[in-house]
Amino acid sequence: MKTETIDIIIPAHNCADTIGDTIKSLDLQLCKDFKATVVIDGADDKLEAVVEAAADSRPWLRCIKSSENKGAGAARNLGIMASVSEWLMFLDADDLLLPHAIATMQQAIPERPEFVIGKTMRESERGCYEVVGREQLTWLHGRMYNYSFLTAYSITFPNDLRMSEDLAFNMKCAELAKNVPETSWPVHIQRWNGKSLSRRSGASREQARTYIKACLDYAVNCVRAEREPEDLRLLPDALAACYYYLDAVERLFPNDHELYAEMCRDFIKLAQTVELPRLRTLPAWEARLARSLALPSRPYGTAYMPELTFEQRFINATLK
């Protein structure tokens, strides 16, 4: 029998220098009704020593080890299989949860959502923060998932993908979910990690292409399946995600006109497709689509919210 406790699954590989701060952010949670599982992906004596030492003084923390490095998706699948909780969150081993994160997510449990979208504060290379929510529909960061929903539809992370495995997982969730609330405030901090696979320029180029294509495919499949308007609440958010990655392609690869033109053509084709009269019955459809299409270009390294004082204090305190 699964409990209503939230289980936080942390895939870990070559992160002995950062996972201590991640665990420390869990120490500071205002709500203590949670468990955390670190899945060590591949033999790493230094990382194992750090996690095991932390687990000795934290009854809510446990460690699972995989002798072979199979990637973050496979590690998350191990964590899901070992979970005893009805609710799951995924946290990278170099990211942080804000102190109110668990308490905020628990407020959504009585609604029995398929998953909950929590806003994320994304750190730039320059140390500034951008707040991201539903428009990043592809992210795992700051999300909470219902275990029964995942198992009912056999939703797992593709074990054969080393990149964009989170995309495949989230697009399947978005396609099948009907109740997806969003938090009002950020719950998660994505820290800058220049060594991350998705930060390397070659990988970022391919990832941007993969992300946009998957968002477009998801939206097109929704339209072709002639789903009812009430089942298409996330479609404008998929469009917003497309637009976001188009903006990223333009900013990160300003000289790659071919890639940008290809993505723009696909996006415009989809935007024309979803203007079908059938979709106009979706509540506030046109307004939401307009917001998706009118997202401003985001200058790299810009802070977007003046209300970051508390979060900044937390970051400074956590990293001391």
Segments from the language model and where they lie:
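A conserved acidic beta->alpha catalytic loop
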Residues: I40-A49, E68, D92
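Membrane-interface aromatic/basic loop that binds lipid-linked glycans or pyrophosphate carriers
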Residues: K2, A248-K320
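Catalytic core of nucleotide-sugar-dependent glycosyltransferases
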Residues: P186-N193, R200-L232, Y245, R251-T273
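Conserved nucleotide-sugar donor-binding catalytic segment
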Residues: E130-S204
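Glycine-rich, basic loop-to-helix element that forms the pyrophosphate-binding segment
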Residues: S66-S83
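Short, acidic, metal-binding catalytic loop of nucleotide-sugar glycosyltransferases
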Residues: K24-D33
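Short aromatic/hydrophobic "clamp" motif used to bind/position activated sugar donors
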Residues: L88
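Conserved donor NDP-sugar-binding/catalytic core segment of glycosyltransferases
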Residues: L96, H100-Y129
